[in-house]
């Protein structure tokens, strides 16, 4: 771990991430929800450096971006990895089942619950009862493209958006865990802990986003990732949300009319 190359703020962020992960890690073997993007690679690398017994878990339709990219990044990290390929034959029924269970007319919530259904299913196959995710990083560090619009309205507008997105994410992850419980799996989010959120809010905005034309964002997260050995290809990769990278979004829009889904 090349801690010496970090700035003081990056060191603080790293220490807070380690602490947050240690607070949720209570089983011998853990799964990590893994797309190969900077957030999940950073989470995986920290767990690897801590000496944890880890399996990287990816889901997606065959030949989807996340399936292919995650394989490449897992190999570069030298970590164990497995992939759950979503069956086109059963996807519609799974989507309907989750729609009924969470009873929320929100496209993103349904997409995420479907994604974690397959992650939890894969974890169960490996007798893993806890899966750790990097949810919270995009919310706290301006990962979403929408932050480019709010930054033009000033810092207060960005801070309001951070709060709103965190509130939504915390509520959504309760629905995710409801779905994952079918497989006796808990989905843990260390970067949505109260302590980590409070720390994340103290990091100056210029370390997160540099104006309305900033296509990269999450700058301190990306720098930290490269400092501890995350492949540059992942660390500098632009955001592609789980539901798009896995092709869940595309396929859910295809089946929603079948079930009269209102989103």
Please name every model-derived segment.
Residues 3-228, 242-254:
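ATP-dependent adenylate-handling active sites, centered on carboxylate activation for C-N bond formation
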Residues 209, 230-237:
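Acidic/polar loop patches that form or flank catalytic/metal-binding clefts of enzymes
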Residues 236-239, 255:
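Generic cytosolic/nucleocytoplasmic N-terminal low-complexity/intrinsically disordered segments
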Residues 251-263:
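Long, continuous compositionally biased terminal/linker segments
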């Amino acid at each position: 771990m090349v801690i010496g190359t970090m700035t003081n703020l990056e060191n603080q962020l790293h220490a807070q991430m380690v602490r947050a992960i240690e607070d949720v890690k209570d089983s011998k073997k853990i799964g990590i929800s893994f797309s190969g993007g900077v957030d999940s690679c950073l989470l995986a690398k920290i767990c690897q450096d801590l000496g944890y017994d880890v399996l990287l878990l990816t889901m997606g339709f065959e030949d989807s971006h996340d399936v292919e990219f995650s394989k490449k990044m897992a190999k570069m990290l030298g970590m164990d990895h497995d992939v759950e390929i979503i069956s086109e034959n059963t996807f519609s029924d799974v989507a309907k089942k989750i729609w009924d269970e969470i009873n929320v007319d929100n496209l993103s919530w349904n997409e995420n619950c479907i994604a974690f259904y397959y992650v939890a299913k894969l974890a169960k196959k490996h007798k893993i009862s806890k899966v750790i995710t990097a949810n919270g990083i995009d919310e706290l560090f301006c990962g979403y493209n929408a932050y480019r619009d709010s930054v033009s309205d000033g810092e207060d507008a960005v801070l309001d958006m951070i709060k709103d997105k965190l509130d939504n994410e915390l509520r959504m992850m309760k629905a995710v865990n409801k779905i994952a419980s079918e497989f006796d799996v808990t989905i843990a989010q260390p970067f949505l802990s109260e302590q980590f959120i409070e720390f994340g809010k103290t990091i100056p905005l210029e370390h997160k986003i540099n104006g309305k034309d900033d296509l990269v964002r999450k700058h301190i997260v990306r720098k930290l990732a490269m400092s501890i050995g995350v492949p540059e290809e992942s660390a500098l990769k632009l955001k592609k949300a789980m539901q798009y990278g896995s092709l869940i979004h595309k396929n859910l829009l295809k089946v929603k009319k079948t079930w009269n889904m209102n989103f």
